[in-house]
A protein has these predicted regions:
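Conserved N-terminal phosphate-binding loop of PLP-dependent enzymes in the Aspartate aminotransferase
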Residues: 1-420
């Protein structure tokens, strides 16, 4: 595979950006490569500057559930651009998108539009603290909630990929109020509440973890979190930046039947544009300025172009939910079976999955980190050399889109099954 142009561009990028990238995992260091530079994408395919074609299972880290360059989404964005790129003012699209979200996720009675998952989570936690008048928060080892200071403690995603358990540059005081629990471990949560339950503002969790690889919740775990937070007057926040509108039209909360107090959304809700959401119970969200004293604002919040992409995407998902989600499940199950046929240890929930290179059943951060990252690098490079574009990290998810064709799935399965 010729990557001459990508290598030249990467050499230039190193002079301008740390590691030559704008997000650490993209540097591909954990898989022993330099990154590909992408020229264009359409449907299920992505094309690099050297003309190589790949079947894309990164899907921009989750947003592209409909595939790249979906015609209705492109049309909506193009039309919105004709009216101006940003207003810094109210517009009707904000209401239309909010209605679509609330209709499909009834736990979100009131919401705010922001620009990234990090911003959504940061704001949701501030709201939880303001509402409860408490400072401490509980997060889980291996769960990643963006790069705000108080949450960069044993995080997943790029932190785990690059073996950085806690980020430098974060004063100790920022994380003193962050309490760590083990994912899928009720006892570890119970101990925290036994010790200081009346000081805990919220528990934030990925209802299906997807940033230490895909790790589904054990039966009853989310229900336990709902019950213990209610008992102690704490709020339950579901970080559905990845799972929202992907595991079902109503997200993980509908799939698992557990209703959080607050939810954060990103990726799919913006249709491929920078847009995220935080929202929840009306009485909680009324704490946000100008109604309340919890402050949050943003120059580009509710950007009309991003909102148009979100509306178009959610309308397609809503209109075609009875065909899209079963189709995603069927295609994803085929790939999962191919992984199992190759002897791989796979976790899958809906259209997200991870093949873990470990003999242990992966249920939390400790078991995820037993994975052989060198073996994963071999697997990644085998896929790439055969035209399959997967995450350059053992600890990221593989995403299936509605645009993946039968031929795509068949080829992918053949390449995976050849890796033994």
């Amino acid at each position: 595979m010729n990557t001459t142009q990508s290598e030249k561009l990467y050499a230039q990028a190193l002079d301008f950006m740390p590691g030559g990238v704008n997000s650490p995992v993209r540097a591909c260091r954990s898989v022993g490569r330099t990154p590909l530079f992408i020229d264009r994408a359409e449907g299920s395919k992505i094309y690099d500057v050297d003309g190589n074609e790949f079947i894309d299972y990164i899907c921009s880290w989750g947003p592209n559930i409909l595939g790249h360059k979906q015609p209705d989404v492109i049309k909506a964005v193009t039309s919105a651009c004709q009216n101006g790129l940003t207003f810094g003012a109210c517009h009707s699209g904000e209401i239309e998108l909010a209605e679509l979200i609330r209709k499909n996720m009834p736990s979100i009675e009131m919401l705010r539009l922001v620009n990234s998952g990090t911003e959504a989570v940061m704001s949701a936690i501030r709201v939880a603290r303001g509402f409860t008048k408490r400072d401490k928060i509980v997060k889980f080892e291996g769960c990643y909630h963006g790069h705000s200071d108080g949450l960069l403690v044993k995080g997943g995603s790029g932190l785990l990929t690059n073996s950085i358990p806690n980020s430098a540059g974060v004063p100790k005081g920022y994380t003193d109020t962050t309490l760590l629990a083990k994912y899928n471990d009720e006892e570890s949560v119970q101990q925290l509440f036994d010790n200081c339950g009346d000081e805990i503002a919220c528990v934030i969790v990925e209802p299906c973890a997807a940033n230490m690889g895909v790790v589904p919740p054990k039966k009853g775990f989310l229900k336990f979190l709902r019950e213990i937070t209610e008992k102690h007057g704490s709020l339950l926040i579901f970080d559905e930046v990845i799972t929202g509108f992907r595991l079902s039209l109503g997200g993980a909360q509908k799939l698992y039947g557990v209703k959080p107090d607050l939810t954060t959304l990103g990726k799919i809700v913006g249709g491929g544009m920078p847009l995220a959401v935080y929202g929840g119970r009306k009485e909680i969200m009324e704490c946000v300025a100008p109604l309340g004293s919890v402050y949050q604002a943003g120059t580009l919040s509710g950007n009309p172009v991003a909102v148009s992409a979100g509306i178009a995407t959610l309308k397609i998902l809503e209109k075609n939910k009875d065909s899209i989600y079963p189709e995603l499940e069927r295609k994803s199950a085929k790939i999962e079976n191919a992984m199992k046929n190759a002897g791989l240890n796979v976790n899958r929930v809906g259209s997200i999955m991870t093949a873990f290179f470990t003999d242990k059943k992966v249920v939390d951060y400790d078991t995820a980190t037993t994975a052989d990252t060198k073996r994963y690098a071999e697997y990644y490079n085998r896929l790439l050399e055969n035209g399959i574009y997967a995450a350059p990290s053992q600890f990221e998810a593989m995403f299936v889109s509605f645009a993946h064709t039968e031929d795509d799935i068949e080829k992918t399965c053949q390449v995976i099954e050849s890796f033994k």
